[in-house]
Protein backbone atom coordinates (compact mmCIF):
# COMPACT_ATOMS: atom_id res chain seq x y z
CA UNK A 1 0.00 0.00 0.00
CA UNK A 2 1.17 3.50 -0.75
CA UNK A 3 2.56 5.60 2.11
CA UNK A 4 2.91 8.97 0.41
CA UNK A 5 -0.14 11.21 0.51
CA UNK A 6 -0.18 11.92 -3.24
CA UNK A 7 0.21 8.21 -4.03
CA UNK A 8 -2.71 7.36 -1.74
CA UNK A 9 -4.82 9.98 -3.51
CA UNK A 10 -3.84 8.58 -6.93
CA UNK A 11 -4.95 5.10 -5.82
CA UNK A 12 -8.34 6.51 -4.79
CA UNK A 13 -8.73 8.42 -8.06
CA UNK A 14 -7.71 5.39 -10.11
CA UNK A 15 -10.30 3.24 -8.36
CA UNK A 16 -13.01 5.86 -8.88
CA UNK A 17 -12.16 6.15 -12.58
CA UNK A 18 -12.03 2.37 -12.97
CA UNK A 19 -15.57 2.03 -11.66
CA UNK A 20 -16.79 4.89 -13.86
CA UNK A 21 -15.15 3.38 -16.96
CA UNK A 22 -16.54 -0.04 -16.08
CA UNK A 23 -20.09 1.34 -16.07
CA UNK A 24 -19.58 2.91 -19.51
CA UNK A 25 -18.15 -0.30 -20.96
CA UNK A 26 -21.00 -2.30 -19.46
CA UNK A 27 -23.58 0.06 -20.96
CA UNK A 28 -21.94 -0.25 -24.39
CA UNK A 29 -22.04 -4.05 -24.14
CA UNK A 30 -25.68 -4.03 -23.01
CA UNK A 31 -26.81 -1.77 -25.84
CA UNK A 32 -24.81 -3.85 -28.33
CA UNK A 33 -26.55 -7.03 -27.18
CA UNK A 34 -29.96 -5.36 -27.41
CA UNK A 35 -29.13 -4.21 -30.93
CA UNK A 36 -28.07 -7.68 -32.08
CA UNK A 37 -31.29 -9.09 -30.59
CA UNK A 38 -33.28 -6.50 -32.55
CA UNK A 39 -31.41 -7.41 -35.75
CA UNK A 40 -32.10 -11.10 -35.13
CA UNK A 41 -35.79 -10.33 -34.64
CA UNK A 42 -35.82 -8.37 -37.90
CA UNK A 43 -34.04 -11.20 -39.69
CA UNK A 44 -36.56 -13.74 -38.39
CA UNK A 45 -39.58 -11.72 -39.48
CA UNK A 46 -38.78 -8.64 -41.58
CA UNK A 47 -41.26 -5.86 -40.94
CA UNK A 48 -41.17 -2.10 -40.66
CA UNK A 49 -41.67 -2.26 -36.89
CA UNK A 50 -38.74 -4.65 -36.46
CA UNK A 51 -36.58 -2.50 -38.72
CA UNK A 52 -37.52 0.62 -36.77
CA UNK A 53 -36.65 -1.12 -33.48
CA UNK A 54 -33.27 -2.18 -34.88
CA UNK A 55 -32.50 1.33 -36.12
CA UNK A 56 -33.48 2.83 -32.76
CA UNK A 57 -31.21 0.35 -30.98
CA UNK A 58 -28.42 1.19 -33.43
CA UNK A 59 -28.77 4.89 -32.70
CA UNK A 60 -28.64 4.31 -28.93
CA UNK A 61 -25.57 2.09 -29.24
CA UNK A 62 -23.79 4.60 -31.51
CA UNK A 63 -24.52 7.38 -29.04
CA UNK A 64 -23.14 5.46 -26.07
CA UNK A 65 -20.03 4.40 -28.01
CA UNK A 66 -19.39 8.00 -29.09
CA UNK A 67 -19.74 9.21 -25.51
CA UNK A 68 -17.34 6.53 -24.27
CA UNK A 69 -14.79 7.61 -26.90
CA UNK A 70 -15.28 11.28 -26.04
CA UNK A 71 -14.63 10.60 -22.36
CA UNK A 72 -11.56 8.46 -23.07
CA UNK A 73 -13.07 5.22 -21.80
CA UNK A 74 -12.32 3.43 -25.07
CA UNK A 75 -9.90 4.33 -27.86
CA UNK A 76 -11.38 6.01 -30.93
CA UNK A 77 -10.28 3.17 -33.21
CA UNK A 78 -11.98 0.68 -30.89
CA UNK A 79 -15.14 2.78 -31.01
CA UNK A 80 -14.98 2.99 -34.80
CA UNK A 81 -14.56 -0.79 -35.04
CA UNK A 82 -17.54 -1.42 -32.78
CA UNK A 83 -19.72 0.97 -34.79
CA UNK A 84 -18.65 -0.62 -38.08
CA UNK A 85 -19.57 -4.08 -36.81
CA UNK A 86 -22.97 -2.87 -35.69
CA UNK A 87 -23.72 -1.15 -39.00
CA UNK A 88 -22.50 -4.15 -40.99
CA UNK A 89 -24.86 -6.49 -39.12
CA UNK A 90 -27.98 -4.59 -40.15
CA UNK A 91 -26.75 -3.81 -43.67
CA UNK A 92 -26.13 -7.50 -44.29
CA UNK A 93 -29.76 -8.32 -43.46
CA UNK A 94 -31.09 -5.38 -45.45
CA UNK A 95 -29.12 -6.52 -48.50
CA UNK A 96 -30.51 -10.05 -48.14
CA UNK A 97 -34.06 -8.70 -47.83
CA UNK A 98 -33.62 -6.57 -50.96
CA UNK A 99 -32.39 -9.54 -53.00
Curated annotation (Swiss-Prot):
Key words of the record: Ribonucleoprotein, Ribosomal protein, RNA-binding, rRNA-binding
Signal peptide: none
One Gene Ontology molecular-function label: structural constituent of ribosome
Source taxon at top rank: Bacteria
Swiss-Prot/TrEMBL GO biological process terms: translation
Gene Ontology annotations for the cellular component aspect, listed alphabetically: cytosol; small ribosomal subunit
Ranges in coiled-coil conformation: none
A Pfam family that the UniProt record links to this protein: Ribosomal_S20p
Functional summary from the UniProt entry: Binds directly to 16S ribosomal RNA.
Family, per entry: Belongs to the bacterial ribosomal protein bS20 family.
Entry protein name: Small ribosomal subunit protein bS20
Annotated organism of origin: Cyanothece sp. (strain PCC 7425 / ATCC 29141)
